[in-house]
Amino acid sequence: KNNNYLSYDMAKDQSSYRYRYDDVQYKNTTKLGALFNWSLMKGTSKYEFRNFFNQRGTSSLSQREGTDFYSDQNIRKWESLYTGRTTYSGQLSGEHKLREDMNKLDWTLGYAFAAYKEPDRKVVKSLESTTDGDSRYYVSDPTRYYQDLKDNSASTALNYEHKFAVSEMFTPVLNTGVYGEFKKRNFDARRFVYNMLGSGYDRFAEWDYSSVFSDANISTDRIYMKESTNKSDSYTSDNLLGAAYVAAKLNWGERLNANVGVRMEYYQLKLDGYESDGIKPVHLDQNATDFFPSVNIAYNLNEKHQVRLAYGRSVNRAEFREIVPYVYYDFALDANITGNVNLKNAYANNMDLRYEFYPAPGETVTIGGFYKRFDNPIEQTYMEAGSGLQYTYHNADHANAFGVELDIKKNLDFIGLKGLSFVFNGAYIHSRVYFAEGSFERDRAMQGQSPYLINTG
């Protein structure tokens, strides 16, 4: 079942369908993976070279039948799709211990490649027409899509740790480091529409998916292919991230421990493409410098009981797909999805207070409360686009989330199941997202946020 609803009808106290479909999907996936890791120990130094490769191919055929209530038509739809995903990541790293383990230096060089291809995606829609009581389905604008995406990224990191032997009761540790990453994306897509000539339309009214794309049907009196590729169907983008941090682990005796630090990040995003109309060029160049402090304080009441207080600030940067103006048709949603070049980064302030109980080795009981404040949270929203559905992304004003969480880990030795444990995690979350004055959106729960989460095993 694949249903979509219009706004709730308060007068009739009922939901109204936008569409109501029955979907059937056939899918086959093949995977190929390779892993190669190499390490070398030399004195107080350790070197590692890690490689990971994955290739995944998926072939799928989707068939749909139902009613589009917005256009008041019965429809049938087919999608044939092959997707190929390739990922590779390689990392060369080293770790060096200096001065009797009082100092440690580690570094990393990395490269990653990712590719996604849809070499020939076919979509066919048929609309029902009734004449003199005779119902027939007429093929409407069969379409073929081709798209190719490539990501290349390089990264480097350097970290240093120094231990201070001030006294037996006070042994602070200083950590500092830098990080850099550069990522570049190239995206190209093409779109072709099969147009039926007037003289041959009725003859091919009830074509099905298996025959409509046959090369034998391409002729001057039947079907011709028309390219409908837009300038917005291709874009290039890159982002640069530079970061530095300093942190300290502090302890006062055996009861009080604290981890404090701050991380500075410089981020630059560039995008070259066109708006969805294919006329107006888009040249995006954004940069920002942010600071992210963090504090984690733990107080040991005794060997089995501990109270922990934590605070941290984080960022949720918009992904490429959330920014680019490329319009992608999602068959499952029966809707177009496009990005928003005006999207802002979202920031979160996180606070956490927990009580921790350790009844036995390997066992824990933790209960706590948390609060999160989000500024400019990114959410997917509906936008008007004629008779079809279209979604994009936008920033809400702010959002809050708070709740309680319970964690339990219990060994099962007492019932004869040695080596096995029972684990439980449950949370209640209340969230609310707020929109600026004048917005068509109403304040509501955060998108995709469930009020209850339970994991056990």
Identify what each model region corresponds to.
Residues 370-373, 390-457:
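Gram-negative outer-membrane beta-barrel transporters
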Residues 2-11, 30, 60-68, 118-126, ...:
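Outer-membrane beta-barrel translocator domains and adjoining extracellular loop/strand segments
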Residues 43-44, 99-104, 164-173, 252-255, ...:
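Short loop/turn motifs that connect adjacent beta-strands in outer-membrane beta-barrel proteins
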Residues 1, 47-49, 103-109, 172-178, ...:
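Transmembrane beta-strands of outer-membrane beta-barrel proteins
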Residues 59, 64, 117, 207-224, ...:
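Surface-exposed extracellular loop regions of Gram-negative outer-membrane beta-barrel proteins
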Residues 12, 16-25, 143, 147, ...:
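Signature of Gram-negative outer-membrane beta-barrel scaffolds
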Residues 1-62, 86-90, 100:
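Transmembrane beta-barrel wall of Gram-negative outer-membrane proteins
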Residues 42, 53-57, 98, 111-117, ...:
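Transmembrane beta-strands of outer-membrane beta-barrel pores
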